[in-house]
């Protein structure tokens, strides 16, 4: 048995059994059995089930948002945004699978997409509704069947969304849910009868999966992993706007987005010091409250264990010589040890660990010039998101061509994303772009289909071929 706990008050809100290896095997066999008939349906026929599912999501939007908020600690207004984003992706996913045609000298040449088969989808805890269904929708559209394993920290919202899929009339076996911890995930990822795996989560787990799948090149592995994301601020006139975008980039979702700014890089000037002073003063004013608080910007992190880990990270940096500009503290008086205040720490004089951490802690580095800022931005094995706040187009051009990242932002918060653009990184941040048309590259494989509606001899036969004439009586 395992349980889900509301991080705002430590209340147990869900209990259930972990799926055993035998139950995982049964789910995969159901998906395999359902695959041939599901794949035979046209995309339009498959889309009708998805459209029905999304209508049900819209009807239950507030209840789903409340469940999401209770289970993750995400403030309620942000939980509503996640449910809305999940719905809005569908139209773009559908457009990605429209057939493309080309003309040959006789007949037609089509580029079509064929489904892989049975896909395992692993969801993260920070966006437990939006991200996994961002994989599930295009995979179903393409004709795959799915076994979905959500994060062990978010079983309740995953169960509720899954029940809406079932209510949509989806044929039995097309989408299967297995709940559990690591053993359940291992049983699914190692199952010999899955054709691919879509994983969103930590780079540590992603590397394990990458090694595991190295011996199975016939199976597709799509990884959307973490980041140690840099934000450079330089030559900005509107300091208040830059401070606002920095707060949004670092502390939204209590710092629990893979695209959040982890490293703030400043060229050491008097203007940068003004910016930093205002950032610290403004961050002190951030309202932290329960997930149901409509006026709060930050709720708790996902668990008390995660909060403890983050506080230890801050302590380690201080012991190395980092200087807290705004100390991240426990706010247990709000209801649990999972509540933290935002923290800003000057790490200019120390070497920091190049590791992703999920939480409201921003590391600051002061450098001598813009070239040094870009070098510091690239001082990471990750390559997910990177941003520049600057009035200078010249600096942005230098930044764009110099920085290594899959998501590059200029005068925008790092955590923003467009459903019509590829989402994903380079390096240790993964190999997957689970957005828009790029999802089609992972959910189906392209097939060139050259077609003519009749057979006829060419005007001139190839050299060395002589055909006998068929007898009229024969």
Set out the residue ranges of the language-model regions.
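Rossmann-like NAD(P) dinucleotide-binding subdomain of oxidoreductase/dehydrogenase enzymes
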Residues: 101-241, 367
